[in-house]
């Protein structure tokens, strides 16, 4: 991703002597010096122009034309441009590439300015500070995050402070964590842009757009002061962050940077949430990836848990649902309140509620743009129409003494009468897209604007009336009153009627066959009419800006309404999903353990015709399940579905199971699948061991641990020894709820040593030379792994399968004779004479006469007689070979 540094304040020497440049280029270079690592979009008329190296870079990234025009300092001016009315599409492309763009507008009046029109950078568009609807994903929050590190006291590890902001939503959050936890938190938050000093950014592995700031931006005292100013308080004690020094340092840098990019204060950032690791069920990077919450293992958006659940009626709901899935809560009270609300919704008319919600606009983002004074006319009309429908939403929210959450939402959705009335009076029913086009402010809102519009709109009728009066007054029947852009309004009289022209006519233009005149009355009207449209647009722009200011005091209530609508949408969506997918309400209890009855994998179930539901019981006397069975038998699916049911329960959703009783959970760990990290210089086995080590260090008795085929990637004895030791450690030290899938059948002896371990297996049956997977979890260990049958299904050549069968038979016989599994040298010759056939089978063999004859037969082209003859020939060849 692109990196940016803090602005410098001096002209780059590469541009040569400053006084050798033209006045306009001097203006540009001053602006560019404040944004040296940012593309500068310099407004010139209907285009944003880029110059010098910015032009070259933009031409390459945007595939636009690079040209030269004029000279400055004796050199051609390299330039490229984009039309201002289509700038959003170019900004979107640049931001996706990790670039930042400074938008430089004309703020002076060309009519009264000598030299270059005054310009200034009005905002800086960076990956983390997007506010335009065209640049934002509807269903993903866009976060700007700052990281600050404070040295630990007395040799302790440094404190890492995080502050992150959803700029358009106005949500500010803080937390502190350890350095080793940083990447996990970045994976959870997934910011679009990170701010930090050099040393901190160099230690960040997360792939993200980065902006480097000097160390002094991350000052604790300055950060605390900036945060108090932002929140309008004298103390931060009430927010619980006064002692979070590293987080305060990060917050100060974050708020200053965000305000600088917008060129104004952040009026809508009026609250603060302090997060603690203990609030949420811990999900590390591997777990989020393996459970495919919002992205598949291949990096696709579907099929995932989010894509299955997201039938939300609003974009606000989709964003909140995504947040909930990544933040399951440890405290049972909140998910239980959500589940109770879902139950009440299911008993009512949730379909009508969802229908109404679909008609609403994105109040959260409109409110953010309103706070930044960048809301467009249709934002305001959408906001007005949404506020008008709040009573309908409230009526459709069922009220119950058993669902306090729904009551809270009902109260939060009271219509703000003053704001709604103001929008109704001020904004047209269907306003123009941009205020510069006019047609935004409603008639009757401002008398001066109405008068100017009347002049402009009644211009045609005035000219018709004037023409009729002048014909009658002068007796010139073919007199015409007209207008053109060069000469304005005029009265045209043919040369043959010139003698009838009154004295008050003043000649304006002479043509070959006619004269054009102006009268005092027409001149007065011309002055008024020609300026009326410009004055109306100017007046409308002023009124619109004033309207935005008048709406600012309503920001807190609008933010509350946005949050309530999003939550109502998610709850109604989860109710719809529970109904459509036949999910049930889980029971969250104090007693440790997990008991799932006929549980299903929520996503896989939708991808197959028939899904086999399974039970899963983990309790104090049954902490670890050793899962054996064939590849493709469903072990990984069984493990993942258990984790997803637990996660959904603590999100507050219903779950894909007939019944679920789940005790306290603090973390979910997964060690599933095989993948290397070539960029990081780590093999598949190293990645596996690194993830296993993290689990062994961090898992607690309330953690859910999924371990899939641990120990592969090394020799048989090494892998088996590691798998045995890891399973024992999880039982004796971590005591976590553990699902441990393995192909090491020796591990099935573990329950003999630990009473809290139990064997289960995924069943399969052989059918002829093939295998049928039953996908049913049954008690006890599997009888075999069916590896050869799976290899055959995969299309492994038959000679290889035959050789493997013989080798397997010898290995099993050797194991039975010695009571041990041999540590094999795969490159050694067979040590048993009976295995010569296996070695022979593995080598290429000359085709037999019978095989050659079979290869030469084309059954589709044979007559019945030909087929009978061929059968006799094959029988003869078979007898001869025998």
Swiss-Prot record:
ATP binds at residues 629-636. The keyword Nucleotide-binding applies. One of its GO terms (cellular component) is cytosol. It comes from the Bacteria. PROSITE patterns: DNA_MISMATCH_REPAIR_2. Coiled coil: none annotated. CDD domains: ABC_MutS1. Signal peptide: none annotated. GO terms for molecular function: ATP binding; ATP-dependent DNA damage sensor activity; damaged DNA binding; mismatched DNA binding. Keywords: ATP-binding, DNA damage, DNA repair, DNA-binding, Nucleotide-binding. GO terms for biological process: mismatch repair. This protein is involved in the repair of mismatches in DNA. It is possible that it carries out the mismatch recognition step. This protein has a weak ATPase activity. Belongs to the DNA mismatch repair MutS family. NCBIfam families: mutS1, PRK05399.1. This is DNA mismatch repair protein MutS. It comes from Ralstonia nicotianae (strain ATCC BAA-1114 / GMI1000) (Ralstonia solanacearum).
């Amino acid at each position: 991703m692109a990196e940016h540094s803090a602005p410098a304040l001096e002209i780059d020497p590469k541009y040569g002597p400053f006084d050798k440049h033209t006045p306009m280029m001097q203006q540009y270079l001053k602006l560019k010096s404040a944004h040296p690592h940012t593309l500068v979009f310099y407004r010139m008329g209907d285009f944003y122009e880029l110059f010098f190296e910015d032009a070259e870079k933009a031409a390459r990234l945007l595939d636009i034309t690079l040209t030269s025009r004029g000279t400055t300092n004796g050199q051609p001016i390299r330039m490229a441009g984009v039309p201002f009315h289509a700038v959003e599409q170019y900004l979107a492309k640049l931001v996706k590439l990790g670039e930042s763009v400074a938008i430089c507008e004309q703020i002076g009046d060309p009519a009264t300015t000598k030299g270059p029109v005054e310009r200034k950078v009005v905002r800086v568009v960076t990956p983390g500070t997007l506010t335009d609807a065209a640049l934002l994903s509807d269903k993903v929050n866009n976060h700007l995050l700052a990281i600050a590190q404070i040295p630990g006291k007395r040799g302790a590890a440094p404190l890492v402070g995080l502050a992150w902001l959803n700029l358009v939503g106005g949500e500010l959050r803080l937390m502190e964590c350890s350095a080793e936890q940083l990447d996990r938190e970045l994976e959870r938050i997934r910011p679009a842009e990170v701010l930090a000093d050099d040393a901190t950014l160099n230690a960040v592995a997360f792939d993200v757009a980065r902006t480097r700031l000097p160390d002094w931006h991350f000052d604790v005292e300055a950060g605390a002061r900036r945060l108090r100013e932002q929140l309008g308080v004298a103390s931060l004690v009430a927010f619980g962050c006064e002692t979070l020094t590293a987080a305060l340092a990060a917050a100060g840098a974050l708020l200053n940077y965000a305000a600088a990019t917008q060129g104004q204060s952040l009026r809508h950032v009026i609250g603060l949430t302090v997060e603690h690791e203990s609030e949420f069920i811990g999900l590390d990077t591997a777990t989020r990836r393996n459970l495919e919450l919002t992205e598949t293992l291949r990096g696709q958006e579907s099929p995932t848990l989010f894509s299955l659940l997201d039938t939300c009626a609003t974009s606000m709901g989709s964003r909140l649902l995504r947040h909930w899935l990544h933040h399951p809560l440890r405290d049972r009270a909140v998910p239980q309140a959500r589940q109770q609300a879902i139950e009440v919704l299911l008993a009512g008319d949730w379909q009508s509620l969802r229908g109404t919600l679909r008609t609403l606009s994105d109040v959260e983002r409109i409110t953010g743009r309103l706070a930044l004074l960048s809301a467009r006319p249709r934002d305001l009309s959408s906001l007005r129409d949404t506020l008008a429908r709040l009573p309908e939403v409230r009526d459709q929210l069922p009220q119950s003494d058993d669902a306090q959450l729904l009551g809270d939402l009902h109260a939060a959705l009271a219509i703000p009468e003053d704001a709604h009335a103001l929008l109704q009076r001020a904004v047209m029913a269907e306003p123009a897209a941009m205020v510069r086009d006019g047609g935004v402010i409603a008639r009757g809102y401002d008398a001066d604007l109405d008068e100017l519009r009347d002049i402009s709109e009644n211009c045609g009728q005035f000219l018709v009336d004037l023409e009729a009066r002048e014909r009658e007054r002068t007796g010139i029947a073919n007199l015409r009153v007209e207008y053109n852009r060069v000469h304005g309004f005029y009265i045209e009289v043919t040369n043959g009627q010139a003698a009838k022209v009154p004295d008050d006519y003043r000649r304006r233009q002479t043509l070959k066959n006619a004269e054009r005149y102006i009268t005092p009355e027409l001149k007065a009207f011309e002055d008024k009419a020609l300026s009326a449209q410009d004055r109306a647009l100017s007046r409308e722009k002023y009124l619109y800006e004033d309207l935005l200011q008048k709406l600012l005091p309503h920001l807190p209530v609008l933010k509350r309404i946005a949050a309530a609508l999003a939550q109502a949408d998610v709850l109604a969506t989860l109710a719809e999903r529970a109904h459509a997918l036949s999910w049930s309400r889980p029971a969250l209890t104090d007693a440790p353990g997990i008991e799932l009855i006929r549980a299903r994998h929520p996503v896989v179930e939708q991808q197959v015709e028939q899904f086999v539901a399974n039970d899963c019981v983990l309790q104090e006397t049954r902490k670890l399940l050793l899962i054996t069975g064939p590849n493709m038998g469903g072990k990984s699916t069984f493990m993942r579905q258990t984790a997803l049911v637990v996660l959904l329960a603590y999100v507050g959703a219903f779950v894909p199971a007939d019944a679920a009783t789940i005790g306290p959970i603090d973390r979910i760990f997964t060690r599933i699948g095989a993948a290397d990290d070539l960029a990081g210089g780590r093999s598949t086995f190293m990645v596996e061991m690194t993830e296993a080590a993290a689990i062994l260090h961090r898992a607690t008795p309330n953690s859910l641990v999924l371990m899939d085929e641990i120990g592969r990637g090394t020799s048989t004895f090494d892998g088996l020894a590691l798998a045995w030791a890891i399973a024992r450690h999880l039982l004796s030290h971590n005591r976590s709820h553990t699902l441990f899938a393995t192909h090491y059948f020796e591990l099935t002896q573990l329950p003999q040593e630990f009473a809290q371990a139990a064997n289960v297996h995924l069943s399969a049956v052989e059918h002829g030379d093939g295998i049928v997977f039953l996908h049913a979890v049954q008690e006890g260990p599997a009888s075999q792994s069916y590896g050869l049958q799976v290899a055959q299904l995969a299309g492994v050549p038959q000679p290889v399968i035959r050789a493997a069968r013989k080798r397997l038979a010898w290995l099993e016989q050797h194991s039975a004779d010695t009571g041990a599994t041999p540590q094999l040298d795969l490159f050694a010759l067979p040590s048993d004479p009976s295995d010569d056939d296996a070695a022979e089978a593995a080598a290429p063999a000359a085709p037999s006469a019978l095989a050659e004859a079979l290869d030469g037969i084309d059954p589709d082209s044979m007559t019945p007689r030909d087929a009978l003859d061929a059968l006799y020939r094959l029988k003869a060849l078979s007898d001869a070979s025998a």
